[in-house]
Swiss-Prot record:
Protein name as it appears in the record: Probable glutamine--tRNA ligase
Motif extent ('KMSKS' region): 499-503
Native organism: Caenorhabditis elegans
EC number of the protein: 6.1.1.18
Residue ranges the record marks as coiled coil: none
GO molecular function per UniProt: ATP binding; glutamine-tRNA ligase activity
NCBIfam families in the cross-refs: glnS
Motif stretch ('HIGH' region): 276-286
Reactions listed under catalytic activity: tRNA(Gln) + L-glutamine + ATP = L-glutaminyl-tRNA(Gln) + AMP + diphosphate
C-alpha cells in the first residue's frame, strides 16, 4: 500500500493524493511500483507521472511484466505517455505468445530520440498541408486533427511539446485571437437528453449499477437506423482469437494452444449464440438479445446459433421450442445451427466428474434455505474425500437420493458474494429429448459457459445481470482446461405498463385476464406480431436504443412512434367506419357520379402508382362522431344542421337536410344534399366514409395496466392483478370496411384513414374479418378531431 509520502514523491498534487488514497486497489498497485522504482534510483517528476500512469493503465493479464516496464521508465527507455501506452499494448497482445525484448523495445520506441528540430519540421509539414483551410477558419480549425496527424508522423514525440509548437505556429500564422475568434460559436440546438452511453466495450468493464433509466425518443442519439450500422460502428468487441486482451480474462499455460485451435475451428469468423429457455414465449426484451447476437454475427460476416437452454424439464414444453424458432425467423434471422444444451448432457456429466477429481466440486446435503443468500455457513460436506464425492455423485445419477437430498456444488465465490453455486440437482422428471435417461440436471451457471466452449462461441453476449457470473464463467472453463470464450454484457430492455415475467404472464392467462401468450395487450413478441407490429419496426426500435450498459425502461409510446413511422410508409390507406351513421344523398342521381373511384394506397407519395377502387353510392356511412345534431359547439368542424362537410377522395360537399329517428328518438339516418366541391365555398373539414361496405369486428387495444410499474409493491400494494385497466380492450362488432380489403389475409396491415393502423387477426373467418388496432395516429384519430 503506497503511503501519502510515496504518492507525493511521484509529483502528485495534494488533491490527487487524497483522491488516490480512496482507491485501495490502485494504492496497492502504486505501492508495489514505487518500491520497484526506488531500487533503480531517484524518481523525478517526469518518471513519477509515468509510474502513476502505469498503475492506472495496468491490466491483470500483464501485471507479471510490471518490473520490466518500471525498469525501462527508470532507465529512460520509456520517456513519454505514448511510449508507455505502446508498451502496455505490446504486453497485452503478447500475453499468450510471450514477449521478445527486441520486439518490445521496437514497439514502444525505446532508444528513439525525437528532437525539438524533428517536432518543428513535422509541425511545419502538417500545417503546410492545411494552411489554406487554417487561414480561412482561423482558430475554429480543429487543432486535434493536426495533433492526430503529428502523432502518426512522430509517435514517440512528447505530446505537450508538440501541442506547444502547434499553438506557436497558429499565433505566427494568424496573429492574436480577435474578439470574433473569442466569441462563443453558435451551436445547433439539439434535444436535451443524457450523455451518450459508452460503447459496449467500455460498458462491459463499467462498475455495476442498479439504476434503471427511462428513455424517450430524444435519447436515440446514441443509436442507429439499423442493427448492421449500430453493430459495425458502436460494438468495439475483441477480434476473434484475442480473448486474452479483455479485462478480467484469465490466461493459463494452455490458453495459447486452445485459442489457436479455436481460431482454426471457426475459420477466424465471429460465432455467437442466442440461448433462450424453452419455458415460455419471447418478449420485447428478447428482441434486443436476438438482434445483438444475430446482428453482430451478421455484421461481422459470422454466424449465430440458436441454442435452447433445456436444462429444466419441469417447465419446458414443445410448443415453446417451435414458437421461439418461429419468432427468430420472423425477426429476419436464420440460425447457423439449432442446438440444445441437452445435446451435451453426457459431456457435461464427465466434466463434473473431472471437477470432483480435481477437488473443485463436492456433493452437498444442505437444503435450499441453508444455501440461499450471501452470509451463509460453508457446507459441512465441503471437504469430504474426493473418492466419496465421486461415489455420491454416481449415486445421484443412479437415482439413490430423493429430490433436494443432494446437490453437486462448485468450490468458488461469485463476484456478488454467493458461495459454492450449485452445478447439478436431482429432478425425477422426464426430459422432452432425453426421456428418463437422466435424473440429474445441470444448472444454468454450470451449463452456459461449457456449451459456449463446446460450440466455439467467440463472443458470449448477454444482459447485465450475468455480469456477476463472469468470474465463474471463466473459472469453469479454465478449471477444465478447455477453450474459454469472452463474456460481454449489455443493458436489459424493459417496458412500462406491462409485465414480462413468464410466471406472471401465466397468471394473467389462468385468471383469464388475457387470452393466451399472444394476447395483443402483452409485450411478448408473438403478441406484438399479432397486434400488427412489423418485425422491421421492432428491429429498428432496438437499433435506435443503441448499445448501453444501463438497464433501460421504455414507455410504450416510444415503440409506438417507431412502429407508426414504419407503417406510415408501408401500410396502404383505406377507409373504414367504426361506429357507422347512415347518410342518404337525396340528389345522388343528379350528380352523375361514377359507380366507383380510384383512391391511392399511399397518397403521401405521388410517385407510388398503387391504388384501390372504392364504391360510390347514394347511401354512405360516416362515423357517428362526425355528426352533431346541434351547432352549440363552435369548435366542431364537421357536419351539423348548419355546417357542411367534405367527403375525402370524391370531391363532394354534404349539406344537412333532415334527420330520421327511430321510435326511441335516436338518430338512425341523416338525409343530405351533395354538391361538387368548388374553390369558393370549401368546407372546414373532410371526413372518411364507406359505401356498400362489409361488416367486420374491430378490437381496440389499450394499456393492460393502469400503473407504469404494476410490479412495484409500494405503488400497487394489491399486486399486479389489482392494477388491470378495465378498458384495455374494446370490441366493435359491426364496424364497416371498404370492399377493397374484404379478402385480406391474416397479418395484412392497413391505415384506416383518420383512425389508426390496423392488422388482420388470426381469429378472422371466411365470413367475418377481425382487425386489431396496432397503433393510433399521432393526433389520436378521428375521435380526437373537431
Amino acid at each position: 500500500m503506497a503511503t501519502k509520502e510515496e504518492l507525493l514523491s511521484l509529483g502528485l498534487s495534494d488533491s490527487k493524493v487524497a483522491e488516490t488514497l480512496k482507491n485501495v486497489k490502485l494504492t496497492e498497485t502504486i505501492g508495489s511500483i514505487v518500491k520497484l522504482a526506488s531500487e533503480s534510483g531517484e524518481i523525478s517528476k517526469q518518471k513519477g507521472t509515468l509510474l502513476y500512469q502505469l498503475a492506472t493503465k495496468l491490466k491483470p493479464q500483464v501485471a507479471a511484466h510490471t518490473p520490466l516496464v518500471v525498469k525501462y521508465i527508470m532507465n529512460d527507455g520509456i520517456k513519454t505517455e505514448p511510449q508507455l501506452s505502446a508498451a502496455i499494448e505490446y504486453l497485452l497482445s503478447h500475453t499468450v505468445k510471450g514477449i521478445q525484448v527486441p520486439d518490445f523495445e521496437k514497439s514502444c520506441g525505446v532508444g528513439v530520440v525525437v528532437t525539438i528540430d524533428d517536432i518543428e519540421a513535422a509541425v511545419t509539414k502538417v500545417i503546410g498541408q492545411h494552411r489554406e483551410k487554417i487561414v480561412a477558419e482561423r482558430y475554429s480549425f480543429p487543432a486535434g486533427k493536426l495533433l492526430g496527424e503529428l502523432r502518426a508522423l512522430l509517435p514517440w514525440a512528447d505530446g505537450a511539446i508538440t501541442k506547444k509548437e502547434v499553438d506557436l505556429r497558429f499565433l505566427e500564422l494568424l496573429g492574436p485571437k480577435t474578439a470574433e475568434d473569442l466569441a462563443p460559436k453558435k451551436k445547433e440546438k439539439k434535444p436535451e437528453g443524457p450523455k451518450p452511453s459508452k460503447d459496449a466495450a467500455a460498458a462491459a468493464t463499467a462498475p455495476g449499477t442498479k439504476n434503471q433509466k427511462e428513455a424517450s425518443p430524444e435519447e436515440f442519439a446514441d443509436g442507429a437506423e439499423t442493427m448492421d450500422e449500430l453493430l459495425r460502428t458502436r460494438a468495439h468487441f475483441h477480434k476473434v482469437g484475442e480473448n486474452f486482451k479483455q479485462d478480467g480474462y484469465v490466461t493459463t499455460p494452455k490458453t495459447a494452444e486452445l485459442l489457436k485451435a479455436h481460431v482454426a475451428a471457426v475459420g477466424g469468423k465471429v460465432v455467437t449464440r442466442f440461448p433462450p429457455e424453452p419455458n415460455g414465449v419471447l418478449h420485447i426484451g428478447h428482441a434486443k438479445a436476438i438482434n445483438i447476437n444475430f446482428g453482430y454475427a451478421k455484421a461481422m460476416g459470422g454466424v449465430c446459433n440458436l441454442r435452447f437452454d433445456d436444462t429444466n424439464p419441469e417447465k419446458e414444453e414443445e410448443k415453446f421450442f417451435s414458437a421461439i424458432e418461429d419468432i427468430v425467423h420472423w425477426l429476419g434471422y436464420d440460425p447457423a445451427r439449432v442446438t440444445h444444451s441437452s445435446d451435451n448432457f453426457q459431456q457435461l456429466y464427465l466434466w463434473a466428474v473431472k471437477l470432483i477429481q480435481k477437488g473443485l466440486a463436492f456433493v452437498c446435503h444442505q437444503k435450499v434455505e441453508e444455501m440461499r443468500g450471501f452470509e451463509v455457513q460453508l457446507s459441512p460436506w465441503r471437504e469430504r474425500p474426493i473418492e466419496e464425492n465421486i461415489q455420491l455423485f454416481e449415486d445421484m445419477k443412479n437415482g439413490k437420493f430423493d429430490e433436494g437430498e443432494a446437490t453437486l456444488r462448485l468450490k468458488l465465490t461469485l463476484e456478488e458474494g454467493k458461495v459454492d453455486p450449485v452445478a447439478y440437482r436431482i429432478k425425477y422428471v422426464p426430459h422432452h429429448r432425453t426421456g428418463n435417461q437422466w435424473c440429474i440436471y445441470p444448472t444454468y451457471d454450470y451449463t452456459h459457459c461449457l456449451c459456449d466452449s463446446i460450440e466455439n462461441i467467440t463472443h458470449s453476449l448477454c444482459t447485465k445481470e450475468f455480469q456477476s457470473r463472469r468470474s465463474s464463467y471463466y473459472w469453469l472453463c479454465n478449471a477444465l482446461d478447455i477453450y474459454c470464450p469472452v463474456q460481454w454484457e449489455y443493458g436489459r430492455l424493459n417496458v412500462n405498463y406491462t409485465v414480462v415475467s413468464k410466471r406472471k404472464i401465466l397468471k394473467l392467462i389462468t385468471t383469464k385476464t388475457v387470452n393466451d401468450w399472444d394476447d395483443p395487450r402483452l409485450f411478448t413478441l408473438t403478441a406484438l406480431r399479432r397486434r400488427g407490429i412489423p418485425s422491421e419496426a421492432i428491429n429498428r426500435f432496438v437499433a435506435k436504443l443503441g448499445l448501453t450498459m444501463s438497464q433501460m425502461v421504455i414507455d410504450p409510446h416510444v415503440l409506438d412512434a417507431t412502429v407508426r413511422d414504419y407503417l406510415n410508409i408501408h401500410a396502404p390507406r383505406t377507409m373504414a367506419v367504426l361506429e357507422g351513421l347512415k347518410l342518404t344523398i337525396e340528389n345522388f342521381s343528379e350528380l352523375n357520379l361514377p359507380s366507383s373511384v380510384d383512391v391511392p394506397d399511399f397518397p403521401s407519395d405521388p410517385t407510388d402508382p398503387r391504388k384501390h377502387s372504392v364504391s360510390v353510392d347514394r347511401e354512405i356511412f360516416i362515423e357517428k362522431s362526425d355528426y352533431k345534431p346541434d351547432d352549440s359547439d363552435k369548435s366542431f368542424r364537421r357536419l351539423t344542421p348548419k355546417q357542411a362537410v367534405g367527403l375525402k377522395h370524391i370531391g363532394l360537399v354534404l349539406r344537412f337536410v333532415k334527420e330520421v329517428k327511430d321510435a326511441e328518438g335516436h338518430v338512425t339516418e341523416v338525409v343530405v344534399k351533395a354538391e361538387k366541391l368548388s374553390e369558393k365555398d370549401k368546407p372546414k373539414a373532410f371526413i372518411h366514409w364507406v359505401a356498400k361496405p362489409v361488416s367486420c369486428e374491430v378490437r381496440l387495444y389499450d394499456r393492460l395496466f393502469k400503473s407504469k410499474n404494476p410490479e412495484d409493491a409500494q405503488l400497487v400494494p394489491g399486486g399486479f392483478l389489482s392494477d388491470i385497466n378495465p378498458d384495455s380492450l374494446t370490441v366493435v362488432y359491426n364496424a364497416l370496411i371498404d370492399q377493397s380489403i374484404a379478402k385480406s389475409k391474416v397479418y395484412d396491415r392497413f391505415q384506416f384513414e383518420r383512425i389508426g393502423f390496423f392488422c388482420v387477426d388470426r381469429d378472422s373467418t371466411s365470413s367475418t374479418l377481425v382487425f386489431n388496432r396496432t397503433v393510433m395516429l399521432k393526433d389520436g384519430g378521428a375521435s380526437g378531431k373537431n
